[in-house]
Amino acid sequence: MKWVNHEIVTGVIVYGATGDFLATAFSMAGAIFPDKVEGKPGANYWSWRARHRGWSHWPVLYIAILAIMQLGLLPQGADVERGATFICIGALLHIAEDAFCGKVPLFLPWQKVGIKLFTVGSVMEYLFAMAVVILTYIIHAQVMVK
């Protein structure tokens, strides 16, 4: 997915689930982290492309960070822990979103899985993002009514 759609989809999901602007901001930072650490394609596009969606898109990495934090390395409720938690959540949502437009690592960093519902940058990608936003709004509205 394009970064703008990662930001929108992740931000809407987290805000819909938490109603918290700070958690949303941290998750939106996490939503671009897996791509940001891989750098830009540059002149060696195919070399970059071969490495894209590698270790930085491995969900086990972010789940392990969350688990380590639960062991008490950071004080419970600390702002740093909260920020790191939502950055990891944003990265995990990024990986899930990428699984709809290609393949991402799952249990092993070199074993990729996913479905290709759309091509990155296509109209279908933007329609998918819009559908997630609308679905999140409907779910949020239903929960708020009860």
Report residues per predicted region.
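N-terminal membrane-targeting hydrophobic helices
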Residues: M1-K146
